[in-house]
From Swiss-Prot:
UniProt name for this protein: 4-hydroxy-3-methylbut-2-enyl diphosphate reductase
Organism, as annotated: Thermotoga neapolitana (strain ATCC 49049 / DSM 4359 / NBRC 107923 / NS-E)
GO MF terms held by the record: 4 iron, 4 sulfur cluster binding; 4-hydroxy-3-methylbut-2-enyl diphosphate reductase activity; metal ion binding
Pathway: Isoprenoid biosynthesis; dimethylallyl diphosphate biosynthesis; dimethylallyl diphosphate from (2E)-4-hydroxy-3-methylbutenyl diphosphate: step 1/1; Isoprenoid biosynthesis; isopentenyl diphosphate biosynthesis via DXP pathway; isopentenyl diphosphate from 1-deoxy-D-xylulose 5-phosphate: step 6/6
Cofactor, free-text remark: Binds 1 [4Fe-4S] cluster per subunit.
Its job: Catalyzes the conversion of 1-hydroxy-2-methyl-2-(E)-butenyl 4-diphosphate (HMBPP) into a mixture of isopentenyl diphosphate (IPP) and dimethylallyl diphosphate (DMAPP). Acts in the terminal step of the DOXP/MEP pathway for isoprenoid precursor biosynthesis.
Family: Belongs to the IspH family.
HAMAP family xrefs: IspH
Binding site for dimethylallyl diphosphate: H40, H70, H119, S209, S210, N211, S251
Cofactor(s) the protein requires to work: [4Fe-4S] cluster
Record lineage: Bacteria, Thermotogati, Thermotogota, Thermotogae, Thermotogales
Length: 279
């Protein structure tokens, strides 16, 4: 069994920055709180909670409130700044650019955002500008529209959505903006290419991570694919595959990918190298 690891694995810069900042604050002895997962990865969150991070909405539980990488509505951010002695905004810069773009273009047409309505990033966006958030094409009486996307969406799926919307409706003016994170687009491209030579694709990441789910769907088009959060989830029959490729979401630590590779090696796999992890 040949093991190949994608070049682009591990944290993206936004996730890396968020985790490093929280760890530094905790190391300074500060009581750090947030209102949800900093990033969508169970192991990462368990580690931060063990180090002292608290998930709470009670101001008495902490001195520093950290805003998650997905962002929060602007009005909520202002309220938090009045409650806590210190608020550290860890919104990913690319996500924040989406919020700014939504506000800037809201006067030019109805905002239609390709994304999951209940995703934290989309909840935050609607605090910056009113928008329709959906993944399903629909008929509308709107004549002027602006298309945006959740930053972790599949570029191909976003384009298909916009194409269907234009076919279904009679827009007088439709503005299409690519607001998908370039880091996730590059991983998407690599998965589409590398999975073609794989018998099995192992996608490593949190089960409620949008960008990891996207990679899993893409890998499934070209090979058998499994989505795991830990090495323990790798099935015993993996040994029947000749070439196994390993991919990861942007909130997956390199240490977890190394553990997955180690488990595959224990199952008679031979590591054929890549540029993504240290061996």
């Amino acid at each position: 069994m040949k093991i190949i690891v994608a070049k682009n694995v591990g944290f993206c810069f936004g996730v890396e920055r968020a985790i490093r900042t929280v760890e530094n604050l905790l190391n300074e002895g500060k009581r750090v709180v947030t209102d949800g997962e900093i990033v969508h990865n169970r192991q990462v969150m368990e580690d931060l909670l063990k180090k002292g991070l608290k998930i709470s909405s009670d101001p008495t539980d902490g001195d520093v409130f950290v805003v998650r990488a997905h962002g929060i509505p602007e009005e909520k951010l202002e309220k938090l700044r009045k409650i806590y002695p210190e608020v550290v905004d860890l919104t990913c810069p690319i996500v924040f650019q989406l919020f700014r773009t939504a506000r800037e273009y809201s006067s030019r047409g109805k905002l239609i955002v390709f994304g999951k309505r209940d995703h934290p990033e989309m909840v935050a966006l609607m605090g910056y500008a009113p928008a329709i958030v959906t993944k399903k094409p629909f008929k509308t009486e709107e004549k002027n529209v602006v298309f945006l996307s959740q930053t972790t969406s599949s570029l191909d799926e976003y384009r298909e959505f916009v194409s269907e919307m234009i076919k279904m409706n009679n827009f007088e003016k439709a503005i299409y903006l690519n607001t998908i994170c370039p880091v996730t687009v590059e991983r998407e491209r690599e998965v589409k290419e590398l999975s073609k030579i794989c018998d099995l694709s192992v996608v490593v990441g949190g089960k409620h991570s949008s960008n990891t789910g996207k990679l899993f769907r893409l890998a499934s088009r070209n090979s058998r694919a499994i989505w795991v959060e830990s090495p323990d989830e790798i099935p015993e029959d993996v040994v029947k595959y000749g070439t196994v490729c390993v991919f990861s979401g942007t909130s997956t630590p390199v240490s977890l990918i190394e553990n997955v590779v180690r488990k595959l090696e224990e199952m008679e796999g031979k590591y054929y190298g890549t540029n993504g992890i240290q061996r």
